[in-house]
Amino acid sequence: MEVNPPKQEHLLALKVMRLTKPTLFTNIPVTCEEKDLPGDLFNQLMKDDPSTVNGAEILMLGEMLTLPQNFGNIFLGETFSSYISVHNDSNQVVKDILVKADLQTSSQRLNLSASNAAVAELKPDCCIDDVIHHEVKEIGTHILVCAVSYTTQGGEKMYFRKFFKFQVLKPLDVKTKFYNAESDLSSVTDEVFLEAQIQNITTSPMFMEKVSLEPSIMYNVTELNSVTQAGECISTFGSRGYLQPMDTRQYLYCLKPKKEFAEKAGIIKGVTVIGKLDIVWKTNLGERGRLQTSQLQRMAPGYGDVRLSLEAIPDTVNLEEPFHITCKITNCSERMMDLVLEMCNTNSIHWCGISGRQLGKLHPSSSLCLALTLLSSVQGLQSVSGLRLTDTFLKRTYEYDDIAQVCVVSAAVEVEA
């Protein structure tokens, strides 16, 4: 009859402890009225308690610190630190001790050991200590694998390992929204506004040290999270930078294409990379966490084959007096165009000049500026409409209405600059 051999005990003992900051000790005050049976007994006990504050014994918060009593929570972006100790519990010398610590995630296995060299020998009641650090960059299940190999005095090679499983939680809920800016000319521009909503989903407050947007090479970014008062820059969130549990903050950024990219039509179209958010915070006793989002992408607005934008237009004009506007025509297609400009009058707007004139050939991603003259025969807020561009190659006409608005006043009213 086959009998399973007894499990062999190892000469070395492995201890693993997570290193975290201590917490403030809290005591529960127990008091009573002076006329009650205990009298001043409870008050005297609280005064003699070393964990209380002199003169404020009834407050729960003391001046003493306590070491962590459990593993606690680990959040994404924090640094996981652990103390590993291998102790020789036997009465003999152990040789060639190798301690290896690996962290297994859902996607990779990382070696966290500071040194992969074996220790020549370990005498009785001696130990080998190591401290490992790792910035957590994935959520979900993590397994710390600690393996120990050594050789006994009899030359027998021994090996054992232990597994420590823990969960990495998400500390912040980040949501982003993109808004396409509209200029004073009532036309969509290349500027983009990014709204980032950041919510603290942990159980403790956070100090938001930094929330910044790192733009891609195509954009320049302007933070809109502060105001200037009396020459001093003040945060829109006030002087306190704390984010309480389940509270949300909204950060706003304005992105504008760099000049070398904005002048090239067709580059900023379709799905474009905006950049990524870099968030740094601190929790109790200054423990720092950092989180970087993946590259944020947005769908750029489509302009069709030909884009018409206004470079200059007055806000207010006189009734029945000509005024000038400057248009910019951009070929957003990948082919050559031969354009003809037609100007169609409306009930209130009348174009001055020759309609049907040739603008010439326009290469892909090229632009041309065009000065036009028009007048209005009706007072009030009038919409500029009636421009038509025809590509003679494909016999295709592009219509542009409501491209801007002007305020038309009587000539007797002084127009302010």
UniProtKB/Swiss-Prot annotation:
Coiled coil: none
Domain of life: Eukaryota
Any one of the GO CC terms: TRAPPII protein complex
Gene Ontology BP annotations: endoplasmic reticulum to Golgi vesicle-mediated transport; vesicle coating; vesicle tethering
Pfam families: TRAPPC13_C, TRAPPC13_M, TRAPPC13_N
Quaternary data: Part of the multisubunit TRAPP (transport protein particle) complex.
Family the UniProt entry places it in: Belongs to the TRAPPC13 family.
Protein name (record): Trafficking protein particle complex subunit 13
Organism this protein belongs to: Mus musculus (Mouse)
Gene designation per UniProt: Trappc13
